[in-house]
């Protein structure tokens, strides 16, 4: 009963439950069915009475009353007349809310083309009629006639006629022999008369017959649109409008400002324009005005409607009174300020506040301090309810008064209300899910929010004036989710890499580090203590210090929980820390009996979390935070100017390097080296000098010194302590303070040759200061730009991955990826253990020696397994991956593996796609904000030698070496590798060695760790001969293909190959060097080709004609790019390039087949390379290579599939096509990881795999079979598999396709959900396409559901959806049973009853 009464005042329509949304083109009948009346006048409201004009844009008769339950003239007021239509003013008495829902319409006097279907590319009307957009516009805007019915005349259908031609045709054939129309009517006729089935059939025939690719593409486009119309039930002529809908007036409001003026929505202006022109056109037609006037008016009407729908899409932008373009209906949806992103995906919420944050070290981890004033305001409704319940007030008004007066009982009640009611804290920018966490509020005085210091890392917050927002979860479910999922105590691990994120930083680290220092010769050294009591006593009486070496007894428990103890060599400081460790058999004293750097603290917390669980970890973290602060305060570590030590040897090192650079200068002057080489060498020398000075400085800082008087160890250097502990500062910064600042980079990324020799302690000279401003400014400018770029990258990633949700436990996939350790320049940068931890094993992992099973197939690999795997030295493991998961919607839990933020197998409903996107995007922003801290100091990344990273035996793979005239071994092979094997013959390291490297070892040699294996010149690439003989030049003509450049400063000449194609005389030269024997015959190479070496532009000749050379001698050199500094700047665009799957600028060319290289006939500036296959069944493949590119293959070389013909970054599409999905995945994962690794950012591979999975969702049809697709169509992979399964069952021919790689933007726009795509980018295009195809959005992803305002299908929402589905299925079963037993009437009644319940 109560419910009914309440509903009288606010009749709420039952919420519709729906499962999908469809979009299609509105027919005129549909528009009329929405409309409540025609708008005939352009007036809005009467400016004196402020009442809407009748039949105007705000008419109350059409749209509904202005005030609730009150007609316009005031005859009927109040509820009792509800639903009556006033006979005087014609207004229905109802809620004024209907003015937000009721639409009107305008009957157009002439049809008008809908600009979206006309101008949104590709033009739908154009494609359908097979006419160009220009021609259609000519007809629409009354320039040309179009023949719609040629009759028996010589005119063709769709032929355009100008005014004169039309007149001539009328004279020639007579007016009734043919039909030619002009304007939108003409297009309407053409569209209405189309027989789509027939056209589709014809197009299919044409497609089968055509041979040219271009024609095929065109026909396919047209066929696709025709099919879309046929399938969706849209009619083509609906793209021409005869009726324009008018949106409800409250969505385009007119607001009175003070001073009698009005602020209005632009739409009203645009509608007014349409109505004015339409009425004028009606009048002109009635008056039978001359055709030319009517035509002009029709054209203006078309333009007015165009501007209303999409202003500025065609012609001039229509501007308002203040020269500002008017916002049309399309602009309301588009962009960041449009409906989708402003109001549907991002809403402002109530019950929120924001304030500055201050640190709250005495809080527990799950608490935050909330100012009383804020809490009182935020929790008002709860307080009113509690005041009422406790009988302090009987009405809300009284309660309000009590709260306003801030009576004592109010504060008591506030305490009760707040207890155990979590609030959400958020710091913008929210880059990952840890940017919003829940805390229990404690009330504090003052106006600032107190934040626990340990969560600062997660929020990326500091206390220099940052602000944070507070939100109150209201419903019980919201509070529950906040507590169970978002509480800060539940977010101990970082979702990107599974490492703890609740880690002490800065002061706390310094305090803990200070505690753990060991010092020699302290008082009380060697004492033994039985328990902490004795130790405390000794400390307080200064018998021992915190750093004394002592023996102490550490008490813990064994596996059964019985107390055990053990004596350790340790220090009192470490014993104090050990006291805080949870008592657990797996947490030995050893983890805190070491120097407590930030890394070790992080490891310790991780260890505690893995073995003792979450609760213990949280308590432990809080305790070590307190301890850290206390001791940082007691230690009083600070530093002064004298703590920055300048090494004595600095002057000597600088002098030596200056001497070196002068020598290089001299060599350059003597012409021994080129300008580029000199630059590289100078830069190198200074780089090494800087490193050397830094080493000396660090050695001085680390040095342990003793006080000659007391004999005790002097206090460690404070700066060193801060840096070494990881509290603040890096070696790089210390170098700039006390060593030398080193080389600086120009804004272009090049390094300035003259370094900054001074450091900040000595002070910079004016010139040095000026040189250093470059880098510093570039850093600041970059930061601003890159923050935006990074944010955009994250947005694209989220958009492409938003529907990757864990939807089942196991998909049963039998394919996966092979994981191997990542080796870079001989260093293992990611061990196999790190890579497979928390993943599911695909095959059983066996011990290589004993053969026993370490991990069974289908089990998740845990920490304990990783230890065994690493010890066993296993080098490759097959694991399940999201990339190869076969789940239909989403990913399965087995393929994903461990939920990194919890350390347990991932739960169903986890939105792994969004987590992946945030994990990749968040460090992007972090890094971009971090560039300028280096102050532009250059870091050169180039190595010139290779050292053994292990002891072992050398094995050469693809061995191809010769001894040159100096007796050195020289590598002649393109893909030779040096392997180092351990005693058991297992590969420990693999190094690629480049062509032309000098080898110091040979097959079977043993090497020690750190021994030089090979070296090469990193700045030039050699061209070497592999036969002994005499050099002769071919086509090396002075002035044409070779120039002798004399260096201005030195007068020494060197001979360089120049671009010979620039002159007509030199166009067919092929500059080369040939090696002949004494008789003058050209020698043969081992692979059968002539010993002719083609030279590319910029090669520097190293020998004279006629010189005698031995195998392995360098005959020419190619300069390489000079070393540019690497910085995430190169990084962020690189990541974007990889995710967008763009072809890199100078991309590598990859061999598609195995075979032999042959040179074909060259083009003008391309070189033709043909690969002759080893297998006769395959066609040879040819490649065209730009001639200027450094090219290293010779005629007759053997090449394998997947090898590079031309070096560079390979295009991901090529890798996919040639080597397949797994190779592509490992390439993308490694390349992206490389960029982040340079910055020291850890991201788990699985995140990148999830994104790559989303990029590989489509296949391109190659064989259509009976699928009904056309070759070249892009289809969802899973869709094709399902259709094929069905076809095979029916005994028909299945289709096949190749996987295509789509960039993330493209993939987001191609999601099955048009709502999600429209809210991402190119809104108009997406909606136009969806409407033509009559697309259905099944609301599978997260974004669509947020937009329509439902629970997202992840997490809680995912489970409720599942439960709802099961329930509906069961209900249907029950009703079926009822139907069988008791007849349909009862069952139907039950159905109605159920739907009503569901609606309530």
Curated annotation (Swiss-Prot):
Pfam families: RNA_pol_Rpb1_1 (PF04997), RNA_pol_Rpb1_2 (PF00623), RNA_pol_Rpb1_3 (PF04983), RNA_pol_Rpb1_4 (PF05000), RNA_pol_Rpb1_5 (PF04998). It comes from Brucella suis biovar 1 (strain 1330). Its cofactor is Mg(2+); Zn(2+). DNA-dependent RNA polymerase catalyzes the transcription of DNA into RNA using the four ribonucleoside triphosphates as substrates. This is DNA-directed RNA polymerase subunit beta'. GO terms for biological process: DNA-templated transcription. SMART domains: RPOLA_N. Mg(2+) binds at residues 462, 464, 466. Zn(2+) 1 binds at residues 71, 73, 86, 89. The gene is rpoC. Binds 1 Mg(2+) ion per subunit.
């Amino acid at each position: 009963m109560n419910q009914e009464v309440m509903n009288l005042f606010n009749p709420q329509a039952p919420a519709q439950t729906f499962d999908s949304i469809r979009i299609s083109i509105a027919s005129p009948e549909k528009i009329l069915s929405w409309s409540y009346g025609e708008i005939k006048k352009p007036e809005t409201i009467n400016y004196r009475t402020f009442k809407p004009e009748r039949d105007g844009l705000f008419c109350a008769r059409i749209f509904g009353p202005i005030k609730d339950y009150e007609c316009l003239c005031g005859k009927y007021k109040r509820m009792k007349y509800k639903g009556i239509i006033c006979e005087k003013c014609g207004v229905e008495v109802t809620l004024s809310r209907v003015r937000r829902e009721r639409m009107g319409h305008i009957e157009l006097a002439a049809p008008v083309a809908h600009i979206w279907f006309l101008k949104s590319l590709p033009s739908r009307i154009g494609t359908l009629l097979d006419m160009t957009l220009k021609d259609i516009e000519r007809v629409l805007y009354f320039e040309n006639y179009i023949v719609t019915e040629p009759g028996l005349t010589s005119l063709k259908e769709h032929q355009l006629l100008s005014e004169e031609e039309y007149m001539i045709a009328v004279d020639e054939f007579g007016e009734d022999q043919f039909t030619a129309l002009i304007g939108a009517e003409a297009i309407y006729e053409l569209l209405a008369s189309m027989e789509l089935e027939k056209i589709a059939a014809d197009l299919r025939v044409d497609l089968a017959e055509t041979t040219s690719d271009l024609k095929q593409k065109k026909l396919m486009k047209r066929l696709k649109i025709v099919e879309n119309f046929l399938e969706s039930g849209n009619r083509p002529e609906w793209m021409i409008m005869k009726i324009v809908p008018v949106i409800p007036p409250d969505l385009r409001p007119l607001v009175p400002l003070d001073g009698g003026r009005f602020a209005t929505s632009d739409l009203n202006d645009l509608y007014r324009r349409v109505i004015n022109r339409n009425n004028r056109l009606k009048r002109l037609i009635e008056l039978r005005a001359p055709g030319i006037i009517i035509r002009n008016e029709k054209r203006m009407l078309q333009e007015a409607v165009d501007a209303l729908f999409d202003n500025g899409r065609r012609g001039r932008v229509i501007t308002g009174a203040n020269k500002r373009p008017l916002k049309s209906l399309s602009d309301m949806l588009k962009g960041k300020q449009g409906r989708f992103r402003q109001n549907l995906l991002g809403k402002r919420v109530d019950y929120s506040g924001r304030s500055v944050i201050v640190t709250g070290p005495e809080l527990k981890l799950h608490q935050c301090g909330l100012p009383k004033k804020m809490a009182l305001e935020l929790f008002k409704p709860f307080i009113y309810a509690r005041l009422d319940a406790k009988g302090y007030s009987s009405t809300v008004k009284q309660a309000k008064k009590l709260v306003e007066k801030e009576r004592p009982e109010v504060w008591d009640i506030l305490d009760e209300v707040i207890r155990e009611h979590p609030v959400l804290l958020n710091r913008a920018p929210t880059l990952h899910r840890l940017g919003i966490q829940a805390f229990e509020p404690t009330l504090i005085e003052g106006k600032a929010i107190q934040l626990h210091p340990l969560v600062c890392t997660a929020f990326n917050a500091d206390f220099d004036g940052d602000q944070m927002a507070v939100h109150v979860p209201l419903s019980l479910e919201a509070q529950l989710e906040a507590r169970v999922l978002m509480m800060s105590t539940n977010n101990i691990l970082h979702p990107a890499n599974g490492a703890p994120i609740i880690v002490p930083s800065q002061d706390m680290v310094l305090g803990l580090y200070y505690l753990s220092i060991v010092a020699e010769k302290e008082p009380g050294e060697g004492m033994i203590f039985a328990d902490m009591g004795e130790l405390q006593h000794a400390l307080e009486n200064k018998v021992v210090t915190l750093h004394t070496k002592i023996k102490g007894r550490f008490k813990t428990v064994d596996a059964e929980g019985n107390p055990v103890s053990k004596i350790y060599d340790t220090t009192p400081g470490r014993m104090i820390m050990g006291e805080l460790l949870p008592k657990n058999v797996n947490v030995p004293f050893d983890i805190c009996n070491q120097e407590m750097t930030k890394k070790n603290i992080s490891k310790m917390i991780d260890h505690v979390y893995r073995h003792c669980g979450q609760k213990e970890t949280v308590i432990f973290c809080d305790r070590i935070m307190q301890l850290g602060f206390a001791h940082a305060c007691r230690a009083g570590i600070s530093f002064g100017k004298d703590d920055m030590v300048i090494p004595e040897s600095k002057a000597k090192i600088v002098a030596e390097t200056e001497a070196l650079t002068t020598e290089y200068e001299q060599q350059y002057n003597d012409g021994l080296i080129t300008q580029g080489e000199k630059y590289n060498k100078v830069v190198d020398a200074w780089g090494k000098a800087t490193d050397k000075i830094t080493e000396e400085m660090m050695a001085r800082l680390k040095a342990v010194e003793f006080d000659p008087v007391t004999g005790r160890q002097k206090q460690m250097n404070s700066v060193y302590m801060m840096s070494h502990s990881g509290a603040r500062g890096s070696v790089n910064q210390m170098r700039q303070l006390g060593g030398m600042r080193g080389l600086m980079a120009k804004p272009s990324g090049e390094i300035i040759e003259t370094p900054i020799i001074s450091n900040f302690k000595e002070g910079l000279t004016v010139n040095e200061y000026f040189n250093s401003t470059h880098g510093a400014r570039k850093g600041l400018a970059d930061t601003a730009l890159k923050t935006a770029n990074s944010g955009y990258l994250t947005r694209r990633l989220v958009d492409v991955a938003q529907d990757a949700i864990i939807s089942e436990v196991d998909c049963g996939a039998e394919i996966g990826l092979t994981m191997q350790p990542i080796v870079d320049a001989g260093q293992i940068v990611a061990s196999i253990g790190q890579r497979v931890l928390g993943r599911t094993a695909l095959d059983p992992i066996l011990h290589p020696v004993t053969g026993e099973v370490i991990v069974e197939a289908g089990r998740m690999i845990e920490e304990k397994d990783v230890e065994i795997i690493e010890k066993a030295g296993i080098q490759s493991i097959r694991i399940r991956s999201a990339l190869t998961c076969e789940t239909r919607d989403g990913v399965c839990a087995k393929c994903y593996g461990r939920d990194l933020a919890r350390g347990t197998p991932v739960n169903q409903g986890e939105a792994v796609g969004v987590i992946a996107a945030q994990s990749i995007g968040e460090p992007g922003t972090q890094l971009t904000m971090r560039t300028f801290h280096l102050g532009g100091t250059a870091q050169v990344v180039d190595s010139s030698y290779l050292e053994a990273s292990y002891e072992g035996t050398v094995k050469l793979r693809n061995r191809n070496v010769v001894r040159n005239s100096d007796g050195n071994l020289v590598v002649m092979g393109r893909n030779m590798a040096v392997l180092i094997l351990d005693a058991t013959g297992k590969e420990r390291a693999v190094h690629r060695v480049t062509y032309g490297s000098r080898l110091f070892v040979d097959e079977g040699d043993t090497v020690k760790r750190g021994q030089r294996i090979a070296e090469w010149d990193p700045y030039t690439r050699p061209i070497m001969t592999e036969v002994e003989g005499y050099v002769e030049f071919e086509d090396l003509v002075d002035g044409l293909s070779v120039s002798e450049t004399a260096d201005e400063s030195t007068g020494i000449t060197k001979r360089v190959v120049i671009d010979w194609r620039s002159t007509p005389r030199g166009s067919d030269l092929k500059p080369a060097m040939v090696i002949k024997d004494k008789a003058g015959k050209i020698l043969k190479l081992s692979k059968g080709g002539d010993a002719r070496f083609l030279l590319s532009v910029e090669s520097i000749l190293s020998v004279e004609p006629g010189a005698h050379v031995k195998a392995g001698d360098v005959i020419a050199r190619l300069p390489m790019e000079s070393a540019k500094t690497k910085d995430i700047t190169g990084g962020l665009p690189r990541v974007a390039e990889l995710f967008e799957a763009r072809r890199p600028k100078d991309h590598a060319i990859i061999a598609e087949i195995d075979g032999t290289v042959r040179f074909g006939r060259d083009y003008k500036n391309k070189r033709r390379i043909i690969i002759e296959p080893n297998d006769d069944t395959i066609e040879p493949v040819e490649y065209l290579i730009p001639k200027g590119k450094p090219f290293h293959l010779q005629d007759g070389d053997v090449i394998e599939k997947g090898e590079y013909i031309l070096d560079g970054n390979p295009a991901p599409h090529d890798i996919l096509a040639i080597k397949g999905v797994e190779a592509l995945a490992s390439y993308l994962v490694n390349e992206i990881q490389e960029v982040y690794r340079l910055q020291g950012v850890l991201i788990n591979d699985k995140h990148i795999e999830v994104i790559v999975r989303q990029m590989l969702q489509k296949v391109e049809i190659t064989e259509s079979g009976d699928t009904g697709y056309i070759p070249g169509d892009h289809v969802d992979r899973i869709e094709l598999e399902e259709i094929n399964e069905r076809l095979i069952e029916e005994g028909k021919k299945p289709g096949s396709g190749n996987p295509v790689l789509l960039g993330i933007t493209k993939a987001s726009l191609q999601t099955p959900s048009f709502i999600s795509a429209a809210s991402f980018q190119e809104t108009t295009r997406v909606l136009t396409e969806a409407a033509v195809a009559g697309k259905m959005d099944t609301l599978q992803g997260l974004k669509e559901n947020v937009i329509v305002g439902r629970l997202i299908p992840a997490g809680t929402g995912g489970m409720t959806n599942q439960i709802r589905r099961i329930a509906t299925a069961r209900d249907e079963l029950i009703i079926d049973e009822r139907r069988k037993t008791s007849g349909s009437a009862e069952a139907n009644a039950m159905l109605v009853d159920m739907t009503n319940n569901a609606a309530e």
